[in-house]
Amino acid sequence: MKSQLRPTQATATIALLALVLAPAATRADTPPSNDGQRYVSVGGQADNRHDQQVLSTLSLPVGQRAWVQAGVGKSRSGQATGGRKPGIVTGGMGVAGQTMQLTLNASHRADGSKYRQTDVASSLDWRHDGNVVGLDMTHRNSRAAGMVAVANGQGGSTTVPAQARVSGNGVGVHGALQATEHVSVYGAVAHNHYKSTTQQTDPSAPGGLLGLNPVLARALLGGTSVVDRDEAALDHSAMVGASYRWDKVAVSGEFTTGQVHDGGGAMRSVELKAAVDVAPGWRIAPGVGRGSSDQGGHTNFASMSATYGW
């Protein structure tokens, strides 16, 4: 049984491949290419700043090679402007052969008129004897609205309604190496080319035109925690990890870093995770970690997911 695939996150794909592709390659019989894609999963994560996210996913095989996925969830950013609580809708599909796999995933986050974000991601993987090399491509379009403080020209400040937009494309590569029978190492790097704009939505309000103001854009868009990292606009990101697998238990450690768009500083995290097959068809995956960002400081976070495959 495979773990869930989270849209827009290449790191989840890498961890999944590192944990389950190697043993699949050593089976005496040859299972369908979409073996392990019939499951339902529920997972959540939270940190000590009250940032939270919950996501449930249903995956179903189609024929012998393809599969489709759908998910719903909710996140809450404790330090985001206005206490943002977007709902999450995800969808995905994939097709796999003996050595190649193609996936397409999309996600949409929305909190009324305050926040909307759409991500589309595709990956093409080459697999051989538990080793994986892949190419990732992404597209993002996000918009956030709220009140921001601007100089009023009289030595003080005033709050005005404003709107920030971020859009652009990204490309990345990822890979996994089966170092020994029990040890896998994996990693990923990505580069995104984003364009951001911030504008005042009420021309009659004091403060003048906001124009291209990255500080205000970051204040509106948020995304400064590991939990809501999927909402952060990262110009560059990288991840490296390793896993050790026993018969029914796998333990992995990861280090992730990224550079926030428009000079927003760095985000970093270290995480220790486990995947435990507790009963036929059932897997639980707890995790703990520590993250930091130049905007949000240090946080401790934890995660837990449960997956049932049949």
Language-model regions, residue ranges each:
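Outer-membrane beta-barrel "beta-signal"
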Residues: Y244-W246, V276, G297-W310
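Cleavable N-terminal export/targeting peptides
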Residues: M1-Y39, G63-W67, Q98-T99
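Solvent-exposed loop segments that connect transmembrane elements
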Residues: A144-P161, T197-V227
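Residues that define the transmembrane beta-barrel architecture of outer-membrane proteins
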Residues: H50-V54, G83-V89, K114-V120, R165-V171, ...
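Repeated loop/turn-to-beta-strand initiation elements of outer-membrane beta-barrel proteins
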Residues: Q64-A70, G97-L104, G130-L135, R143-A144, ...
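Extracellular loop and loop/strand-boundary signature of outer-membrane beta-barrel proteins
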Residues: V42-G44, S75-Q79, S107-A110, A121, ...
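Transmembrane beta-barrel strands of outer-membrane/channel proteins
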Residues: V40-A46, A70-K74, L104-H108, L135-N141, ...
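Short glycine/proline- and aromatic-enriched beta-strand/turn motifs that initiate or cap beta-hairpins
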Residues: T26-A80, F301
